[in-house]
């Protein structure tokens, strides 16, 4: 038992010894590990502290550098501003010095001028006293001279003044008359030159392509047998056609042709159209003739309207009343001294427009007035009154512009022109009518008119010779200078003009020129 206990005790002691050893070893191991961890932590902490110090040192240096840069920049700005202010102050000081010098010079100049003015004032005062003394002497002398003149001439002062005034007034009146005459001649010369330029330009830019109209129309036939069918049994067909149209049919020996004669172009056109339709159809009898005449009349009415619309389009005049357009188209079938009135109106419109453009007037209004100036001729054979009166009534009825109405009323001189456009229309009308080839007359009428023109001119006292020239558009009268003076020459021209207007019918205008010539001849021996 005791040995067992001893063994157990020994075993316990051994176990205890191993436990102590293991405990010591474990303690040492843990201590070593702890020390290693502490050393590692201390090293890491030291490393972090070193890094923080280095970073702080770096940031500090950067901050110091930034502060130094900012300080340097502020110092530079301050120095630059100081330099600029110093320069500006120096400039201001320099300017002030210059101004002071200028003021000093001005002050010196003013002082000199003041001295000069004082001297001049003294001189003027002296001269003033001398002038006053001289004026006093002159006044005394004038009084003495006036008294002497009144005594010698026997005229009072007022009478002498009146005589001098009359002489001066006469001299001024004479000089004024000469000046007025000179300026009037100059104005006329300038106006004539400018008007000739405008008229020549208008004529050059306006070309006429129409020819004189005739009073007959010719209808071609397929053969001469058709003439008998047109005449009809006992002439009933030709009588029906003449009765319905008012046109004379001339059927003679002219091969394959029938001549239509009549003064009314519209009726002649209706007859021509109807006859052509009858010839083409072949059925010719009174009933068919009446049908074709009615159809042709409607077609001609439509053609008239188309002519009116085409004319307004070509001329560039718009806004006309439809009835006025149709009346305008009727002018296509009207003639004046052989000149087609519609073509004449278009020509007048173009001429008036060109001249209005040159003078800065309303071109459209001038063209409108020129186109409508002869509108009364379209129906003057149907309505009583002259074509001027009828035209004014039509323009008023269809509410045309007052300038257009005045242009229609005044283009033949029946009414006074109230605008430049009215005058331009009258001039354009005269240009179109006077253009060579525009209008024609028979030879007998032409010769008789020229003889009558010279006869009227020679019927006045003091007329020596007369010459009708320019195809009767001008008459030149040579007068006796011992009977007709310059003033009477103007009156004679007006009197001859009035008598020509009263006794002659003529197209366009006639220029009356009175020539007075005085010759003084001497012979040197």
UniProtKB/Swiss-Prot annotation:
Residues 341-434 form the HD domain. Coiled coil: none annotated. One of its GO terms (cellular component) is plasma membrane. Its EC number is 3.1.-.-. Residues 109-130 are annotated as: Disordered. It comes from the Bacteria. The keyword DNA-binding does not apply. CDD domains: HDc (cd00077), KH-I_RNaseY (cd22431). Keywords: Cell membrane, Endonuclease, Hydrolase, Membrane, Nuclease, RNA-binding, Transmembrane, Transmembrane helix. Belongs to the RNase Y family. This is Ribonuclease Y. It comes from Shouchella clausii (strain KSM-K16).
